[in-house]
Amino acid sequence: MRLKALLNENIANEFVKFVATELQLQSLPSSIKFVGSEYSREHLTFGTYNTETDEIVIVKGNRHIADVLRTLAHELVHHKQREEGKPADGRDGSEVENEANAKAGELMRKFRYVRPELYSER
């Protein structure tokens, strides 16, 4: 089990670098934390980006690695939006949320060519 966690950590690090390049990020967030599923029960979300602290929190518990990475991509898009001076607006259907959703999906489609084995894992 520890080996799989280590592999997933390596993939997450690789993915952050991939997304940073694709989005042409000026910097990385101050921290990216992976937490258990209790966070999603408490906050009703699988990920957050705090624009004040520049921190990302991603729920990893009981989720496929590709789903975790898609959430990470979504939050990294919010980081990019902050770099561009776009207003934070977490409302469902807002322009920045729709952009983050669409771009995260696009990034996952591109990353499948880098790590196709992600889609054969359980």
Task: List each language-model region with its residue ranges.
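Hydrophobic (often cysteine-bearing) scaffold residues that line and stabilize catalytic clefts
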Residues: 8, 12, 69, 96
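Active-site recognition of the HExxH zinc-binding catalytic motif
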Residues: 70-83
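Post-HExxH zinc-binding segment in Zn-dependent metallohydrolases
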Residues: 90-122
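Substrate-binding clefts and substrate-entry loops adjacent to catalytic sites
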Residues: 82-91
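N-terminal low-structure segments adjacent to metalloprotease catalytic domains
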Residues: 1-7, 80
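Short pre-active-site segment immediately N-terminal to the catalytic Zn-binding motif
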Residues: 55-72, 90-92
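Auxiliary, metal-adjacent structural segments of Zn-dependent hydrolase domains
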Residues: 5-60, 112, 117
